[in-house]
Every structure is written in C-alpha cells, then in structure tokens.
Design a protein with these regions (language model features):
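Positively charged n-region of N-terminal signal peptides that target proteins for export
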Residues: 1-7
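Hydrophobic alpha-helical membrane-embedded or membrane-associated segments
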Residues: 7, 11-14
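C-terminal motif of bacterial Sec signal peptides marking the signal peptidase cleavage site
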Residues: 16-20
C-alpha cells in the first residue's frame, strides 16, 4: 500500500513539473534571473527612467531602485550572451542590437520595431545624443555637419534607427585631422558607420572611436579628453553647465529580452517595473 501511495505521489509530481514546463522545457515556477547594465550606462539610465524604477530616500532624494540581486553586464554583447544562455533570464538592450539568439517581448501589447518607435506606438524609446564643446575643431564641426545632412540621415535610417536631424546637403571640404569619439556602446555602432562613410569622402581625416559608457563619454567631452562624447541617455543640466551642449542625432528603442525557450510573449510596463525592483520573483507570478 505504501509503495502504491509513493508511486502515485511521484507520478503526480512528475505530471505537475511537466505541465509547468509547458512542453517547451521552460518551468514557469522558476525564479527570474534579472540582468541589468552597469551604473553609468546610458541604456540603464534610460530604462530606469522609462519604466519608473525609482525610489526616494527619507530626505526625498531619488535613486535607481534596480534590485541588488540583479546580475550586472558591462555591454550589449554580454547582455545578449547572458540572456541567451539562461532560460530564466530577463534583460534589456537597444532594439537595433537584437539578434536571433534571444527574443524581444512586446511591451503593453506593442512590438519593439523601428516603425513602432517612429510612429510613437512603442513608448520605450530614448534619444541618442552627442556631447560637444562650442570650441570644436574645424574637422569635428564638419563631421557633425555630415551627420546632420541628408547623407547622414539616410545612413541612420538604413541602420535601423529613427533620424531626427535635418541639415544642409553635405559637400566635402577635403579637410585633414583627427577626431576622437568616446562613450556609449549603444551609440557606437551607428557612430562607427557614420565615421566610416565620412572618411571615404575625407581620406585625410582619421576618426578614432573608443567605447565605454555614456557617463564616461560625457565626462571625456567635458574634460577635453575627446572631441565628441556619445550618450544613450539625456545629458542632464548639471553636465551641460560644465561647458558642453547636447545634440540629438537619432532615436532608438530599448527592447526587453528573454531566452528563446521563455513562453512569455508580452509584458506590461508595471510587470517590468515589479521584476526589476525585485518585487516579482518568479515567472509564474507575473501579472
């Protein structure tokens, strides 16, 4: 009799586990592995702002309330690898960095596509900005004119971003010199493409791009350690007060990503907020 009862219990347990996995190898009762970008990342700053993942101290100071249990990654590439190798992970990155190794979920029923970003339906969007000083070199000014031109706009659009600048037609001045660019790993892919195409028209110009994060890029521009700082977040007033100006060059979306085995197709903004605050711990608990 005891053996029979034990056998029944075992069969029920196996059946429950099988059902919870939804025949896909994904167990909804497992804990969510929260993955975030590092502090200083413009993508993290924009993500926290867009999903309102903030709290206040008793003195009223606002701070990033991302759970302390989140795993931290230093780049979009590491984020992709981390989520693609963990069935229960959730992360976020630039829409333009998406690939087939992971899956982007819809937010509030809207897919993260360039068209949805452009028409305003996808709300999880941010600006790509550059930080520069007024006293730029002639060659740096020329490169920015190129970015603003119809050529620059076309490159930005073809690369999957939303162009926002409208400048004059670009005519090369055949300048020479070096331009140093530093900052966001999210902005760097489009900046590298723009730089490559610009140098084809201006063979005596060398553009050197160093990838770090938004805060480092902005600080480098302020300190004169680079000509152009790249930022995937809004450049705040305290930074602008240090002698730089902000130029928006494109718009991009932030996609929330999960493992390909994950059965979740859509998340509400409030669910993402709860997950990243550490209030929602298991996939099965998502409301």
């Amino acid at each position: 009799m005891k053996k029979t009862i034990s056998s029944v219990i075992m069969l029920v347990t196996v059946a429950l586990i099988f059902c919870s996995c939804n025949n896909t190898g994904f167990n909804e009762s497992r804990d969510i592995t929260v993955i975030s970008r590092e502090e200083g990342s413009g993508t993290r700053a924009s993500f926290v702002e867009l999903f309102d993942i903030y709290s206040k101290t008793t003195s009223g100071k606002i701070y990033d309330a991302t759970t302390d249990y989140a795993d931290i990654t230093q780049s979009s590439g590491v984020m992709l690898t981390s989520v693609s190798t963990n069935r229960y992970a959730i992360g976020y990155l630039s829409v333009n960095a998406l690939n087939d190794s992971i899956r982007a979920v819809s937010i509030d029923g809207v897919e993260p596509t360039t068209d949805n970003i452009k028409n305003g339906d996808y709300k999880v969007a941010r600006s790509f900005n550059i930080a520069v000083k007024d006293e730029l070199s002639a060659v740096s000014k020329d490169f920015i004119s190129y970015i603003k031109s119809s050529i620059g706009r076309e490159i930005i659009e073809k690369s999957g971003y939303v162009a926002v600048l409208e400048g004059d037609e670009y005519v090369t001045k055949k300048l020479s010199g070096k331009i140093t660019v530093n900052g966001s790993s999210s902005v760097s892919p489009i900046m590298e493409t723009l730089a490559e195409e610009y140098m084809k028209l201006n063979s005596k110009v060398k553009i050197e791009i160093n990838i770090s994060d938004s805060s480092t890029g902005i600080t480098s521009a302020i300190n004169g350690n680079c000509d152009i700082g790249m930022s995937s977040r809004t450049i705040n007033q305290s930074e602008l007060n240090k002698g730089i100006k902000s130029i928006e060059i494109a718009k991009d979306g932030i996609a929330v990503i999960v493992n390909k085995y994950n059965t979740v197709k859509n998340l509400s903004s409030s669910a993402v907020n709860s997950i990243y605050r550490g209030d929602c711990l298991r996939w099965i608990d998502i409301k």
